[in-house]
Each structure stands twice: as structure tokens, then as C-alpha cells.
Curated annotation (Swiss-Prot):
Task performed by this protein: Essential for rapid growth and for sporulation. Catalyzes the interconversion of 2-phosphoglycerate and 3-phosphoglycerate.
The record's free-text note on cofactor binding: Binds 2 manganese ions per subunit.
Name listed for the protein in its UniProt record: 2,3-bisphosphoglycerate-independent phosphoglycerate mutase
Catalytic activity: (2R)-2-phosphoglycerate = (2R)-3-phosphoglycerate
CC cofactor: Mn(2+)
InterPro entries from the UniProt entry: Alkaline_phosphatase_core_sf, BPG-indep_PGM_N, Metalloenzyme, PGAM_B_sf, Pgm_bpd_ind
Amino acid sequence: MSKKPAALIILDGFGLRGETVGNAVAQAKKPNFDRYWNEFPHQTLTASGEAVGLPQGQMGNSEVGHLNIGAGRIVYQSLTRVNVAIRDGEFEKNETFLEAMTYAKENDKALHLFGLLSDGGVHSHIQHLFALLKLAKKEGLTKVYIHGFLDGRDVGQKTAKVYLKQLEEQIKEIGVGEVATLSGRYYSMDRDKRWDRVEKAYRAMAYGEGPSYQNIYDVVDDSYENGIYDEFVIPSVITRENGEPVAKVNDGDSVIFYNFRPDRAIQISNTFTNEDFRSFDRGEAHPKNLHFVCFTHFSETVDGYVAFKPVNLDNTVGEVLAQNGLKQLRIAETEKYPHVTFFMSGGREEEFPGEDRILINSPDVATYDLKPEMSAYEVKDALVADINADKHDAIILNFANPDMVGHSGMLEPTIKAIEAVDECLGAVVDAILAKGGHAIITADHGNADVLITEEGKPHTAHTTNPVPVIVTKKGATLREGGILADLSPTLLDLLGVEKPKEMTGTSLIQK
């Protein structure tokens, strides 16, 4: 039986902007894209910042883009999720935080705050520490100690004193908190099982062992004098005038670890929480029975409470298609294959019933500017054959070229990449239209639209520019103000499938 497939075609890294200088998207000859743009209803979508669950003004990326597209809802990344919770007042109602604080207060125990001391926003954000200090004050805690991990990697390599100053001012203003230890993230945030490093951080925090200082700034100055910058500062103990450590982590204390990214938080957390820990000798007096809180789910091996539990991504587009008995195809070359499968399915590896996948190998070249067409022609050939064989009701396709070649920051190869993709796009969309089907032509974020910086240097990063959306349905009208989360509801709409309640995005096709 002849199928009338609906396809979601993602031109990866294909952003739109008016200025043509350094803009491969604007400079490329793309007769097929232009033809569909002129012939069919079209709009632009926001693919960056809070519209995709990132902080305001932050550029999108392929993982985040495909996650939002497949989920049909804004998927808040951890940083934004915590920021929004602080902004909306949900943070101070968080039961996991309140339980840790109540426990400390009722049992006359200390609260220790562990985490990376910067505003890098990759592993942590210093504003989250300040929010915890405010909450601790509100809850009437007095014994609150900070074990700060110095960054120098996601921020400038000699910026520790900037953050220590901010912390000092906040402690003064809020009226609670003392710095107990400082260590470079090289030690406290190792993820490569270099346990000798972790042990140094642990012994400073649990036993008060290591270089000692009365003044937090002396830790940094001393290190700088020895050519040791923030990331590598040796775990150091802050002491009172009598030489005693300000605080050690003791039996039964509360801990809140405010890093939200798990990978570099797991080892030090295991050291404090794991009964069966054997990676080094923690000593007889190691702190036991801690009320340990992780900001997000770090790992099954970490014995702790989780403040921001994983978000459930049920009823992504693939699951909805499967529930409705529709056959679906995911197709891309190697570079973007995980995006149309794993990320599009909300972080699920396995196929849904009725889901087929075609992986086309990306070319074996050092960098893709050497072969701008990549494997687009092979992707196109495989897909056109599939369309003509009437196998699938829904198709999700990614052309990697504008993004992967765009990362070279080289204009000419990126123009060639887009011209190759345009040729393939024409063959695919025309095959779909010939079957009476529909295509949604769009992108996940910008990149190829800016290849030269204002200083005239190569620009290799993503952009915050809007992305196109074309729906090949004559007579339809697309609404303005759309976001990536609206694409799956639009695909379901074309297939006559009702979107599930979990999808808060809405079809772009105006009724």
C-alpha cells in the first residue's frame, strides 16, 4: 500500500540572519530550499536560550535541540532548572534541602556546602551557593561551612579571588557561613580515578589536613607565587587564630553538594557516602552517617538524597508514533546519528516498536572542510529508496553538513556543504511530495550563518540566530513565535495524531 509519509528534516546548524558577510547560508546557491520557502508556508523558530531550556542568551546545540524537538516540550537543562526554581521561589520550598537543614538543626550538627566556586555555569553556579546560604539563614542555621572548589577552567585561570570576594560579601550580607577548605578542582573534582588527588581534597575536608591558612586570600596568593593557578591549588584548610580548623566534616553532619553536573561530582561524593569505598584508606575516623544531598542525580553509587530529580521524558514523538501503530524511520550519518535516535527519544537507546534506523557512515577525513558534502548523497540515496518502497509513515532525518563543516570556521567549504545538502534536500522532499506526503524543513540551531567574527577571525561556534521552518502543506498558515518544542506536535498534526498531554509544545499549523 502506498504511504503518504510525513518527514521532519533537520538541517543541522542552518541558522538565519540578514547580514550576508561570513554567512554561508545566505551565500550558498540553494535553489531547492529557496523554492520551498517561496512556495510553502514558512516561519522562523527560536532555538536558543530559555526557549530550549538554556540560560537566556545561550546558544543552542545539537543535543539540546534534538531533546527539545523529540520531547515536544521545553527540556530545562540543570542550570536553567535551578535558576528558574530560585526565581520562582520553588528553591526555598525544596523538601530535600529543608530536610537536610532541619536534620542539622534538630541534631545540633553542621551543614557543609560543597561545590565549584565560580559562575562558569558548566558544573555549578555561585548564585546557587548564595541561594543555599540565604535558605540556611532563613531556617535558623548557624553552623554552615563552605568547602569551595576553585575553578580556573570554565572561567579565567586566575579568577579565584573574584569569587572569594563575592562569597565574602554574601556571607557578610546574609549573616551565615564560613569558608572551611579551598581546593583546586583538579583534586576535588577528578573523574579519572586518580584517587591520590581526591584523597588530598578528602583529607582536608574530613580531617583538616593540608596546608593551613587563617585568610582565604592567602591560599590563592601563596599558590600564585609558586606558579600554581586556581584549578591546581593544593587542598588547603582554613584555621582559626588558635590553629584549629574552622570546620571538619564530622559524623552525622549534613552536606549539600551544589554542583549540578554529575561527572566530576561522583568520586568525591562516593568517598564521603559509599560504605564499601575501597579506592584509598579513608582512616578509622572517617565521617559516617552523613545526611548527604546531591543537587541532581549523580550516580547509583552515591548514597545521597537528590534535590532536583531527573525529569521524566515520557511520550516523546517516537513513543507516540509507536502507540498509534505508525512505522517510523530515523536516518542520519554517524556524526548526527545519536541525535536523531538517543536524544530525539529523550535519552532512550532502544528503538520503539515499528521504529527502523539507518546509519550512514561519515567520511573518514581529518576535518570535514576537506569533504564538505560528507555523506549527504548516501543519506539521500538510502532515504529516497526507502520512501519509494512505501515502508514508513514518519521519517526523522538529519543532514549534518552545515554544522560539522561550519565548525571549521571556513566559509568556502561551508558554502559547498550547504549546496550539497540543498541538492539532497530537493531529491528527498520531491520524493515525499510525489507520494502525497508532507515535509517539515527546519534546523536545531545556528552555526553556518556566522563564520567570521566582528574582528574578521574564523567563527567556529554555534549562534543564537533563529532557524527556518517550512511546512510543505499548501494553503496552511504557520503561526509566529514558535520554538523547537513545537516541531513534534506539528509532525503529529500532519499525521492526524493527537499530541499527548506531556507535550506542551503546540502545532505550528494554525487551525
